[in-house]
Amino acid sequence: MNYFRTAILLAGLTGLFMGVGYLIGGASGATIALVVAAATNLFAYWNSDRMVLSMYGAHEVDPGTAPDLHRLVAELASRAGLPMPRVFVMDNPQPNAFATGRNPENAAVAVTTGLMQSLSREELAGVIAHELAHIKHHDTLLMTITATIAGAISMLAQFGMFFGGNRDNHGPGIIGSLAMMILAPFGAMLVQMAISRTREYAADEMGARICGQPMWLASALARIENAAHQVPNMEAERAPATAHMFIINPLSGRGMDNLFATHPSTENRIAALQRLAGQSGGGLAPGGPPPDPSSPWNKGSRRGPWG
């Protein structure tokens, strides 16, 4: 699952943060940077889910207000061996979704109205399974930590520009401060994006195993990618640091599978799922209970049944 690579990248991000602190204030600056990072992450640990859900205007739904969606999430969570997460809906025309929460016991899955109106039952099952995979892998906490440290690096680098421009034993000087202000956030962004892309591939594979059908997720990714290019997500545009949370990059400026992309290219993700489907003969045994005969995805598929 690429956990070793993720750990190395996270360690590099922390080291970069301490390095910026060292350039500003020497050994004491590095120590202070570490303390600030710990305090910031502690705050994010307890509050990040509420903050991001509020940012996107998500409202919680229950079996009474969204019975089909709630039942689908409950069944997939059971198949994944997870506690039932809270379910939220965002009033946004762009089809997309994300998961948040500090652990599986305090997790939430949020989907847009555009997603519920655009996907078939099977495709929506694939998307929900992908988000549950992030919860199962504790990616929601990991991405909160990386986003928090990356943001702190940017703020610290700007602080160094104004207060680290002297030429004493500790200050990097004006040129060094300028370089730090530009390169440190850039380096943090590269590490953050590399971690995000690593976790997306892992969540795709686990999500396919949870729902049992890799091609459900592959079909959903293709449909969401096509629509996301045409329908802007204004909340995400105002808060681009949250783009990595979504199943498909919600921002208007997208790249290929390279250092500057928040996600792997959708084409590569679909190809990986197609290979997984080919290896398994089209279906996978997730290891959970068999599907409920009354499950939405055992009925005839139709467009947009969740609106």
Swiss-Prot record:
Subcellular localization(s) per the UniProt record: Cell inner membrane
Binding locations of Zn(2+): H130, H134, E200
Catalytic residues, chain numbering: E131
Segments for region (Disordered): 277-307
UniProt keywords, alphabetically: Cell inner membrane, Cell membrane, Hydrolase, Membrane, Metal-binding, Metalloprotease, Protease, Transmembrane, Transmembrane helix, Zinc
GO biological-process terms attached to the record: proteolysis
Cofactor(s) it depends on: Zn(2+)
Its membrane topology: Multi-pass membrane protein
Enzyme class, first EC level, given as a word: hydrolase
Name recorded for this polypeptide: Protease HtpX homolog
Originating organism: Nitrobacter winogradskyi (strain ATCC 25391 / DSM 10237 / CIP 104748 / NCIMB 11846 / Nb-255)
